[in-house]
């Protein structure tokens, strides 16, 4: 079994996100096209966001660092480090209220 230090990845990818013109950095922690379960660590610098997009399937978001706002239609949910959100199946987006890192877990059926 392989272990991964999420704490180390948080620091590494926050540094990358802060320096990137997009304000973001991502790293696949587990999964890929050959797996149903996919986990991606996403770092977003304060003031940046992920544009609204379609849901790929059942998904959750675990905030590892900072604070975020998840939006879907007219609804919005704020979350801080340690919070866990179930992502709606509707179109949604994610805004960094401050430098943040989240662990996105998606189950792809098919």
Regions from the PLM with identified roles:
Residues 73-90:
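Short acidic-glycine-tyrosine-enriched beta hairpin
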Residues 89-110:
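Ligand-binding loop in jelly-roll beta-barrel domains
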Residues 1-36, 71:
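A short, N-terminal "cap"/entry segment at the start of jelly-roll beta-barrel domains
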Residues 57-73:
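Glycine- and acidic-residue-biased ligand/ion/polar-headgroup-sensing regions
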């Amino acid at each position: 079994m392989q272990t991964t230090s999420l704490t180390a990845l948080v620091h590494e990818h926050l540094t990358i996100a802060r320096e990137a013109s997009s304000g973001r950095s991502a790293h696949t922690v587990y999964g890929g096209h050959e797996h149903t379960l996919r986990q991606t660590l996403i770092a977003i610098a304060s003031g940046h966001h992920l544009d609204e997009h379609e849901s790929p399937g059942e998904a959750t978001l675990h905030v590892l660092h900072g604070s975020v706002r998840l939006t879907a239609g007219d609804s919005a949910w704020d979350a801080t480090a340690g919070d866990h959100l179930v992502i709606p199946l509707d179109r949604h987006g994610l805004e960094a209220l401050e430098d943040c890192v989240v662990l996105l877990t998606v189950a792809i059926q098919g």
